[in-house]
Structures are given as structure tokens and as C-alpha cells.
């Protein structure tokens, strides 16, 4: 299955096309995974750093998806190789059961619980080769396999996307939202070498972006993406709502500067009413205008998106919903806010001007003890 965005035709082509309106452009390929043949989700900038296919083989393990699109995950383990799978997802196991050891592992419960990421996993190891079947409880899911060789890191955008993994050097760490950034709340960063199995709702598609290309995606549809220099930024399309300018007479400012309103704003009743108001505003932004919240990705990168979207409250926190809603429509927030520094010549000129510009103050003392200061240049 192959789709082209944008383009008037649906011919599978990767050539540059000329448009009288948009100029030179290249079609972005979206392909479904897994399929009967190997589909690389990397581009020329990553040099085959990782692949997502219907099977992935490492020196000590082999992952293979059985059936499509709603399927089982078959895992073949060599001796002394560890398999981590989400608790309650193991369907069956073949081999010598007396050599198999299963241990319940609690992975960073405090950090993962705070972010809503599952932290109960089952560690399976054996002294002899075994084969295991892994599945999920949801009837509308599909799998995507990622084989990492240590050159490209991945960010898992969905909290429940990670199903199983293997690899001694593979590291999976949850990421906190330190600066209210939408791209690092409830996510998991995957680094190292190994094989991981991701699960998504519906069918999973891969989108490859090259240098200079952009793509807008809904956060509830994004399963994972490769780490890049510029993280995805919140984006809102321009709204067609007609706003009527109302002159500001300053009545509200003068009203809130009164002693009555100042004392009222410090009361518990006022704080309770404001909490209810902000909760209702966040609910309306998430429920009614939730489809206006998007993420903008900059190439080169690779995205994995799912056809069935999760709920917005499963992806974004309350403060993130408000952050995107307050973003100016049609623009994105810069990844790094550069601090404007004046040139050295301008700084020296300003310093010299301040030194040459002297002021003199005259103090007048009255009989009643009152002192008046008058500044002269």
C-alpha cells in the first residue's frame, strides 16, 4: 500500500516535480508496515541505520510478525538471551520449560508512573533456545519492529507503544517534560543496539522526510520517530474565526485594582471558582477543539503513524493542551530561543554615552520636614 502526499497523481515516483504555484517539490512516500517484503524506513541521511519490517534478526534473537495486520509476535531466543515483554502479553512458549526462568521486573516505577508509562514487565531467559508468542489484548492492533544498531535513536511518542524488546546494550528511558515541551511528555527514548517491538492501533505506516521537508501530524497518531536536531514543535492551523475588535477602555483594569477585588481574589471561594473555570477551559480545548492540536516535524527524520488515533488526554497533559491552544495559529515555537546580544561596538558606544551623560539632583528641605528631590540634566 503506497500513498503520495502531496500530488495530483498517484503514480509511485520519487522525482522532483514543478508546480506553478509551489515551485519545485518532492512527493513524500507513506508506506504500510509490516508487509511481505522488507520496507526500509530510513533515508539517505541515515545510511540504513535501522529498519522496520515484518521480521528483525539480531545475533541472539529473532522477532517475526505472524499474520497481518492484526497478528502475533513470534520471538526466537538463543541461550542466555533476555526477553522483556509487557506483563500479561505472553501467549505461549515452546522449548524446554524446565530451563526457562520468568521474573517480574519493575522498571523505574516512580518516573514511569508519573508519566503514565507501563512499568511492569516480564523478563524471560533460558539456558536453551526457546520460542515465545506475544500478543496484546486489544483486537485492533498491529506490530512494527525496529532493529537498532546504535547509530540512530528513536523516541516513542505513545505511552503504550512499547511491547517487547531484547538487547544487552539497549536502553529505554522515560523523558520528563522539563520546559513544558510537547515533544518530551510521556515519551520513551530508545538508544543502543537491539530489537524492539511496537504496537499501534489499526495499521502502522512509515513516513520518511528528507532534508528541508516538513510534515504536520496529529500527536495521537504518532507512534514513534527518529531523534533529530530539531524536536517536533506544536502547531495550529490558521483559524477562520472572525474576531471583532473591541476597544479597551481600561474598565477591567481599574475594577481589579480596587480593594474589594484585591481581597476577593485572595479568598478560597475565588480560587475554587478559578480552578473550575480553568478545568472547564482545558476540557473544551481537549474535547471540542482537540483536532486543532498538531505537531510539525522537520526532516531528515522517519515517523511511524497509526491509522486509529488514541484519545488526546492519553497523549497530552493539561498544561500541554493549554500551551498549544495559546500558540499563535500558523506559526511554531522555535526549538531554541536565541538570546539577542548587541555587537561589541554598540555596547561600548552605549557605555560611553552613559558615562558622558551625567545627572544632578537637588534636594529641598521644608520646615515641616518634607524633602523634595528635583533632577536636572
From Swiss-Prot:
- Subcellular location, record wording: Mitochondrion
Keyword Disulfide bond listed? The answer is no
Among Gene3D superfamilies, the record links this protein to: Mitochondrial biogenesis AIM24
Q: Could you tell me which residues belong to the region Disordered?
A: 340-362
Organism superkingdom:
Eukaryota
List keywords of the entry alphabetically: Mitochondrion, Transit peptide
**Presequence boundaries:** 1-35
Asked if the record carries the keyword Electron transport, the reply is no
InterPro entries reported for this sequence: AIM24 (IPR002838), AIM24_sf (IPR036983), Trp_RNA-bd_attenuator-like_dom (IPR016031)
Q: Where is the composition biased (Basic and acidic residues)?
A: 346-358
Q: Name one Pfam family in it.
A: AIM24
What would be one Gene Ontology cellular-component term for the protein? mitochondrial inner membrane
Q: Taking the first listed entry, what is the main subcellular location of this protein, grouped into a coarse class? A: mitochondrion
What's a single GO BP term from this record? inner mitochondrial membrane organization
Q: Which family does it belong to?
A: Belongs to the AIM24 family.
Name assigned to this protein: Altered inheritance of mitochondria protein 24, mitochondrial
